């Protein structure tokens, strides 16, 4: 579903709990993994959720999602494992800001 452009995406997304991230403005983002046969995607939506205590990184080791994403040139994010994620879209979808990120293959 197409949506309207919402400007610049967040500069940073830090994991708070499994599947829940915070940006530099303390907004919460919910991330869901979408596995395809040959690649991994993350659908990340800016949804206000109550935050409990932050999870320890050691408790998140089984997640396919990174601990942190940082905005990188050319419409990409780099994660804490130095992997690049392409921004496939950054739109407002049904009133919710959404990023669709695709993990790029290692070169």
Curated annotation (Swiss-Prot):
Biological process (GO), any one: intracellular signal transduction
Top-rank taxon: Eukaryota
Keyword Cell wall biogenesis/degradation: no
Family annotation (SUPFAM superfamilies): Oncogene products
Function: Enhances the phosphorylation and activation of AKT1 and AKT2.
Assembly and interaction partners: Interacts with AKT1 and AKT2 (via PH domain). Does not interact with AKT3.
Protein family: Belongs to the TCL1 family.
Disease: Detected in T-cell leukemia bearing a t(X;14) translocation. Plays a key role in T-cell prolymphocytic leukemia.
Protein name per its UniProtKB record: Protein p13 MTCP-1
